[in-house]
């Protein structure tokens, strides 16, 4: 009886809907998406180096910035034993400079400490063994925030290490930038103000930067683009379901009252997956 109840409970975690109901929900989600939503932002920038280059030029003020490589959801691979991070948009330019572009809607996700960790993680990732410290690449960690997390009503906040006595820059090559997504000044006609305005828009027709409007229109108003977005949303939904199932299995493992076979049956996971989860749980608690 216990096994049947567990399996029933796991199934009820996700409300069953028809395919057409899911599709209608997805269309509403797409309609309400803004570039300030990180799921949509990643699709906007995926495999679109020119758009990423344009946005980075506007934010950094580097007019001749030539992006040579751009990836979305970039995993830093050299943080073994440390907290892992996945960068929303990551790029490298012709001078070897590294750019991390992040969307942070929640204030708690846009702390100075988080920005510091991103900057440090990029340093670790791109300085190989035996290389000189002077070979560290120049890096830009950019947080576009939904709210004015710094509270000074500025459009952009630029941070570098400086001498606290006289303001002389350290020139270590690390830059941290917060872009205030809540900034709204009708008299500001700068490209950055236009960009921030567009990041809040749901409709392409309301946007001021053509390149961003065109890409938004593609994903929201063309059959091909909408299909891509629906597939991306479905993949995210499936991943969320899988993570919930893993969490149920981990809870059952922690209880210690069921066999691996019973847990696998209750969660529809394989015995191999249960064994891997147990190994991960043991590593965390060791």
Spans of features found by a protein language model:
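Short, charged alpha-helical interaction segments and adjacent helix-coil junctions
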Residues: 2-31, 92, 99-104, 190-286
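Short amphipathic alpha-helical signal-transduction/dimerization elements
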Residues: 119, 123, 146, 183, ...
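Accessory alpha/beta interaction modules
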Residues: 1-175, 185-187, 286
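Compact structured core domains
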Residues: 174-198
């Amino acid at each position: 009886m216990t096994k049947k109840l567990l399996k029933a409970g796991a199934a009820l975690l996700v409300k069953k809907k028809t395919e057409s109901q899911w599709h209608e929900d997805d269309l509403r989600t797409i309609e309400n998406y803004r570039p300030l939503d990180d799921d949509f932002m990643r699709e906007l920038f995926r495999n679109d180096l020119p758009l990423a280059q344009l946005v980075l030029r506007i934010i950094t003020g580097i007019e001749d910035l030539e992006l040579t490589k751009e990836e979305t959801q970039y995993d830093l691979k050299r943080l073994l034993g440390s907290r892992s991070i996945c960068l929303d948009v990551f790029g490298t330019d012709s001078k070897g400079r590294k750019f991390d572009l992040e969307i942070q809607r929640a204030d708690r996700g846009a702390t100075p400490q988080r920005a510091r960790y991103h900057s440090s993680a990029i340093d670790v990732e791109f300085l190989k063994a035996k290389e000189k410290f002077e070979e560290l690449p120049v890096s830009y960690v950019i947080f576009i925030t939904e709210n004015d997390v710094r509270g000074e009503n500025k459009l952009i906040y630029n941070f570098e290490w400086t001498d606290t006595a006289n303001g002389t820059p350290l020139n270590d090559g690390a830059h941290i930038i917060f872009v205030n997504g809540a900034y709204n000044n009708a008299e500001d006609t700068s490209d950055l103000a236009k960009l921030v305005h567009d990041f809040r828009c749901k409709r392409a027709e309301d946007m001021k930067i053509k390149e961003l409007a065109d890409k938004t229109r593609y994903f929201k108003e063309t059959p091909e683009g909408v299909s891509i977005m629906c597939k991306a949303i479905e993949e995210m939904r499936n991943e969320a379901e899988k993570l919930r199932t893993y969490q149920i299995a981990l809870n059952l493992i922690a209880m210690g009252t069921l066999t691996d076979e019973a847990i696998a049956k209750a969660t529809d996971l394989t015995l191999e997956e249960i064994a891997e989860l147990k190994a991960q749980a043991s590593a965390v608690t060791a």
